[in-house]
């Protein structure tokens, strides 16, 4: 059986190449493949209790280590809830990467749970 490299694998490999060691968030179905790829690439995923705290933790990693960290919130409200932490990191000029999920195009307009337009 041949395994195929996914977009998530490519993203995780690039994040690792740029020095990311941690990713934070509350994953939903839309980002599970990315979380798996990050862990396989050696990026430790830290499950948080809220999206804002995940964003603040990601910012703290950069502030303490100088290495970029990753925020992986679920789609819609998950990403919206993280905005206060993202804004704080922006004000501090932190090197953070936010990779929010999105529903599959074929589900848009049909399956709208937590979808943002």
Predicted feature locations:
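N-terminal alpha/beta PP-like core and its mobile active-site loop of ThDP/TPP-dependent enzymes
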Residues: 1-117
């Amino acid at each position: 059986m041949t395994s195929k490299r996914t977009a998530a694998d490519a993203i995780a490999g690039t994040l690792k190449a740029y020095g990311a060691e941690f990713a934070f968030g509350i994953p939903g179905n839309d980002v599970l493949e990315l979380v798996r790829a990050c862990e396989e690439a050696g990026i430790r995923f830290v499950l948080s209790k809220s999206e804002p705290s995940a964003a603040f933790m990601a910012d703290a990693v950069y502030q303490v280590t100088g290495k970029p960290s990753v925020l992986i919130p679920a789609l819609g409200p998950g990403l919206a809830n993280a905005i206060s932490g993202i804004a704080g990191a922006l004000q501090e000029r932190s090197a953070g990467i936010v990779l929010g999920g999105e529903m599959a195009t074929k589900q848009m307009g049909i399956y709208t749970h937590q979808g943002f337009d």
